[in-house]
Amino acid sequence: MLKVKLLQYTPEPEKTIAAAAKLCYSPVGVDDILENLTDEGAEKFLNMLMSYGHMSPIEHVSFTFAVEGVSRSLTHQLVRHRIASYSQQSQRYVKLDQFEYIVPPAIENDEVAKKLFIDQMQGAQKAYDEIVERLKDKYISEGIGEKPAEKKAIEDARYVFPNACETKIVFTMNARSLMNFFHHRCCDRAQWEIRTMAEKMVNEVKKVAPILFKNAGPSCVAGPCPEGKMCCGKLKEMRTLYLGK
């Protein structure tokens, strides 16, 4: 099951952004700015920044997520968002005695497709186990110790695992990169799995920075759809989902 947890974030993110932006136009230092910066003042200034499209100050705050129950297909898409830091469960160092896998809903709901899919997953596990044992025995016979032999075996045996293989990942993005991520991955044209994750992430960041992320979501939430002829035609539904109106 897909789980998203907001592990950490910059304390008082909206005040931090407002203070950083105000510093650009202030003769005093950040201590004086923060001392006189009320919640209402920070909100007003942040709204002004966002309305002007002045985005560089929001790079000062970051958000760290822990995600579980996702496929390697998802993480291959995720790491294309390059202004971020990623730490993913390793198939090289973690032996998968019984690997978990993600079944897409379209396959789950088709009895024949599901059987074909599960047969392939079970076949991959069987092949992995046999390759690990075969290579491990070979390396031991060559004089390599048992533990390093197993490690050497599993790093090659993992090549049989499919994109469906379940994985876990921790990643950090600054707010500007996160906004860009939401524009692309909350879009109806994004694949179902990463879109579901993005929706959960939006819900998490809105709890701690509601002003900053009030228009978070696909590009069409706060402006025109950039997809041209590929537009999904669901602008009204998307704005209802993300803005509640």
Curated annotation (Swiss-Prot):
Encoding gene, per UniProt annotation: thyX
HAMAP family: ThyX
Organism of derivation: Clostridium perfringens (strain 13 / Type A)
Cofactor(s) required for function per UniProt: FAD
Protein name per the record: Flavin-dependent thymidylate synthase
Pfam family, one: Thy1
Domain of life: Bacteria
Subunit and interaction comment: Homotetramer.
PANTHER family named among the record's database cross-references: FLAVIN-DEPENDENT THYMIDYLATE SYNTHASE
